[in-house]
């Protein structure tokens, strides 16, 4: 991508396209990260992020990608077994992290085409006690959205904490951290927040962080107990990725200006528009293109489009690139038979129309219509 392309050409489901003024904000001089100027910057970031998380709790800022805070969630969950809900590539990663941190982890689910059912979760919770469960709110590999409010209600009846990866949920679809009593919810900078990659943000409930002290082997870099201590001083435990913090402050203010509710609505409209486009495309070209996610569990931020047998999703992605737009290929086991359009972050309906038109043209070319 050339640095001179106009905004509205990059529809990867992460990293997402960043507004020029947000990029520009990173070109500020360094600051000592212990001192008043930094604390002011950090407080500004908190004012931006808290309404996005819908929380009164402080927002931890980790200089890592989102996977870092997934690991932190596992390391800091109170002692006990962990139930991992798997319905896609990223929820599978969460389960792998639990196992690789030496936790007693049980997987429930496994099907990619829908959320893990509450029945299956309840069966598992009845069978034995779990300290926590892991869930991916918006599965970026499939476009499937899980109802984390209902899941949390259920889990809390069994005294099981809920660790939520909302990496492509937060700032694109409603997340009510406080009202839904989420124990820990995390995201990365480079998805629906439309910041460059390199930061992760998370919120822990008071109960979760109080119990985290009992977790042994939390390590150092991802010890949320440390994050909690520093966040109250408007600081981070270690040297933060300062340039990205400048961008976060500016983006938080941009999002406040739009309002989080309007941002959610814009994402809903982008999702609906993309889905209608898929259905019209299928009719027009007479080939089995479809939306992978079930109609009642779609995320607003990304659509995985299934392609008919015999059509190469890779050829579609490459043809779209020749027209000046970036979309995503399939992910994991859906690599060959889906492509993905990331309609999240700061994209507009007009921008989305342009990439969909380029994609339709490409498909007609690939099908030789
Ligand atoms: C992108 C993504 C991640 C991983 O994020 P990194 O920033 O690459 O570590 C985790 N979960 C979901 C749902 C994602 O979309």
Where are each of the predicted segments found?
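PLP-dependent enzyme catalytic core of the Aspartate aminotransferase-like
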Residues: 3-5, 333, 337-369
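A glycine-/small-polar-enriched, mobile loop at the entrance of the PLP active site in fold-type I
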Residues: 5-63
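Active-site C-terminal subdomain of aminotransferase-like
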Residues: 17-18, 190-276
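Conserved PLP-dependent catalytic core of the aminotransferase class-I/II
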Residues: 44-53, 253-291
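Conserved beta-loop-alpha segment that forms the PLP phosphate-binding cup at the N-terminus of a helix
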Residues: 56-83, 87, 91-95
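Active-site phosphate-binding strand-loop segment of PLP-dependent enzymes
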Residues: 116-171
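Conserved active-site segment immediately N-terminal to the catalytic lysine
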Residues: 178-190
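Conserved PLP-binding catalytic core of the aspartate aminotransferase-like
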Residues: 287-319
